[in-house]
């Protein structure tokens, strides 16, 4: 699924792109149906709080781990489809700013795990990283100063807020740019992730 700003059809402007991943057991509709990503974006844009951008939401249930088992979590198949096929397709069929610094990847829970794996393996593709209840980045993950423009990490206050906050502090102390957000009073749920998307945008 692809979200385009309301103004998209009215001109020839090119836009940055966010590749936004769902969690375990969900599909490409999750961020629209449960996450209300389109409404969050429309409101932020209408209020002049953010510059418009495109969101691509794709199916990510391609890893090898099985729910309830101790399987190896692999994003190899999804990585190939996303980076080698989907990104070029989106850049050729939509008016995107087709360069790393205008391309972000973020995800919730399992989608955050996919995001971390893929952004670190393909640093030439994405310039902005976002993990929502999906782990953290460490300074050792970032190999060069120009690898990423900003790292965003979030979770609910009933999850592991100290870990997210500490990770952002450590990244900033190492000279990288990172922000953390803790959704007050929420757990591993879409209220956390809706609020996180609002902050990320």
Task: Kindly give the residue locations of the regions a language model identified.
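Non-catalytic cap/lid and distal C-terminal segments of serine-dependent acyl enzymes
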Residues: 1-201
């Amino acid at each position: 699924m692809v979200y385009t700003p309301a103004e998209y059809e009215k001109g020839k402007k090119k836009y940055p792109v966010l590749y936004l991943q769902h969690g375990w057991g969900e599909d490409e509709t999750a961020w629209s149906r449960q996450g209300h990503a389109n409404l969050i974006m429309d409101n932020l844009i209408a209020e002049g709080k953010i510059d418009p951008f495109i969101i691509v939401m794709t199916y990510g249930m391609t890893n090898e781990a099985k729910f309830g088992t101790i399987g190896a979590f692999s994003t190899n198949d999804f990585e190939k489809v996303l980076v080698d096929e989907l990104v070029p397709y989106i850049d050729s069929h939509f008016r995107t700013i087709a360069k790393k610094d205008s391309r972000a990847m973020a995800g919730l829970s399992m989608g955050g795990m996919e995001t971390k794996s893929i952004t670190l393996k393909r640093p030439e593709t994405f310039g902005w990283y976002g993990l929502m209840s999906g782990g953290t980045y460490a300074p050792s993950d970032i190999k060069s100063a120009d690898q990423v423009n900003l790292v965003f990490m979030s979770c609910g206050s009933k999850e592991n807020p100290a870990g997210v906050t500490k990770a952002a502090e450590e990244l900033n102390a190492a000279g990288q740019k990172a922000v953390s957000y803790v959704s007050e009073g929420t757990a591993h749920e879409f209220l956390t992730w809706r609020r996180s998307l609002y902050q990320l945008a």
